[in-house]
């Protein structure tokens, strides 16, 4: 079990073919790396764990598993499980073919890419996350965020920054975002609890719901699904709403032009099949 002196946050680079990655960030001055075969009864798993390279660099650590020797009909590749305990605030760069990533504690910048595998993160700094197939869960991202999945649910808590979210097949839910938000889905709902800046959202098939927005511009469009937007108390709204097959329900009180000091939300909402609901948050 390699142990390294790391008195300050580091950068960990992980290259993993197949397996599982767990990272625990806490108030500590060292880093511990544990590499185990996923199944210690499989020779290929044991071999890959033994051949995994763990090296300290000037900026942090590199963890790299060997390349698979067989795929598909040629044989099942080896699988290893990596556990890293490191200082809070450390950055993580992960690249894998088939692997799940799990973190707990506060991390810094995170860049994670996996062809297939779920990603479950606790608290990060700026985040760049891409998975070809897998569910994504993030408790809090402290910086600009980009998340993409080919198929799978996306569940994001607080985003303190701008965000770009792309989901080809699956629902997307965000609790709160402070910066500009851009969302795209081919098949799935787009749900936002609170947006503090501009929002652009488009789904080919799915509902779009924004619980509260108090300023900025909202442009949302879906080909098939209901749209619901809550306008924050004390904010005026300029509305441009259209549905081809459905009803428009505006529960806002009619008013004259807003005062110069009022917050104004400009809403453009389009759906081909579905109702549009505008209400007070």
Question: Which residue stretches match the model-derived regions?
Answer:
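Intrinsically disordered, low-complexity terminal regions
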Residues: 1-281
């Amino acid at each position: 079990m390699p142990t390294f002196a790391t008195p300050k946050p580091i950068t960990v680079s992980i290259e993993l073919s197949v397996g599982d990655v767990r990272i625990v960030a806490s108030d500590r001055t060292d880093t511990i790396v544990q590499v185990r075969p996923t199944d210690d009864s499989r020779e290929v798993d044991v071999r890959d764990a033994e051949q995994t390279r763990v090296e300290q660099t000037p900026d942090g650590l590199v963890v790299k598993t060997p390349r698979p020797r067989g795929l598909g009909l040629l044989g099942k590749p080896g699988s290893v499980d990596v556990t890293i305990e490191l200082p809070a605030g450390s950055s993580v760069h992960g690249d894998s073919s088939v692997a799940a990533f799990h973190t707990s504690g506060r991390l810094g910048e995170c860049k994670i890419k996996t062809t297939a595998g779920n990603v479950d993160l606790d608290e990060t700094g700026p985040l760049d996350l891409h998975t070809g197939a897998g569910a994504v869960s993030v408790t809090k991202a402290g910086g600009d965020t980009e998340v993409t999945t080919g198929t799978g649910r996306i569940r994001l808590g607080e985003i303190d920054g701008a965000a770009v979210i792309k989901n080809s097949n699956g629902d997307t839910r965000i609790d709160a975002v402070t910066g500009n938000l851009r969302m795209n889905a081919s098949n799935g709902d787009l749900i936002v609890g609170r947006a503090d800046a501009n929002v652009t959202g488009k789904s080919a098939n799915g509902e779009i719901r924004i619980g509260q927005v108090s300023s900025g511009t909202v442009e949302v469009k879906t080909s098939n699904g209901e749209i619901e937007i809550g306008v924050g108390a004390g904010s005026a709204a300029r509305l441009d709403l259209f549905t081809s097959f459905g009803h428009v329900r505006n529960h806002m009180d009619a008013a004259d032009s807003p005062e110069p000091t009022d917050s104004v939300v400009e809403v453009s909402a389009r759906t081909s099949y579905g109702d549009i609901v505008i209400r007070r948050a």
